[in-house]
From Swiss-Prot:
SS bond list: none
Organism: Yersinia pestis
Protein name: Integration host factor subunit alpha
Domain of life the protein comes from: Bacteria
InterPro entries noted in UniProt: Hist_DNA-bd, Histone-like_DNA-bd_CS, IHF-like_DNA-bd_dom_sf, IHF_alpha
Entry-linked NCBIfam families: himA, PRK00285.1
């Protein structure tokens, strides 16, 4: 199961005593700041969590899987995430929930 923004808002409501509206606004504002920074070409560093980076990919040859026709895959910018050491360690030592 995936963690959603709604669940994050609910956790903030329960743990910090924020109103549901304020908790939702805080989550939205956080993600909007991450989006804004990436749109402006900035790296996003979240200490203890990881880094969001932008990477430019060059045009490359590809193939249409249905027809087998060779087609160019256009150059584009992609977002990558590199987890920090603290996050890696915690995930590796966590016991999976079933």
């Amino acid at each position: 199961m995936a963690l959603t923004k709604a669940e994050m808002s609910e956790h903030l409501f329960e743990k910090l005593g924020l109103s549901k509206r304020d908790a939702k606004d805080l989550v939205e504002l956080f993600f909007e700041e991450v989006r804004r920074a990436l749109e402006n070409g900035e790296q996003v560093k979240l200490s203890g969590f990881g880094n969001f980076d932008l990477r430019d990919k060059n045009q490359r040859p590809g193939r249409n899987p249905k027809t087998g026709e060779d087609i160019p895959i256009t150059a584009r910018r992609v977002v990558t995430f590199r987890p920090g050491q603290k996050l890696k360690s915690r995930v590796e030592s966590a016991t999976p929930k079933e």
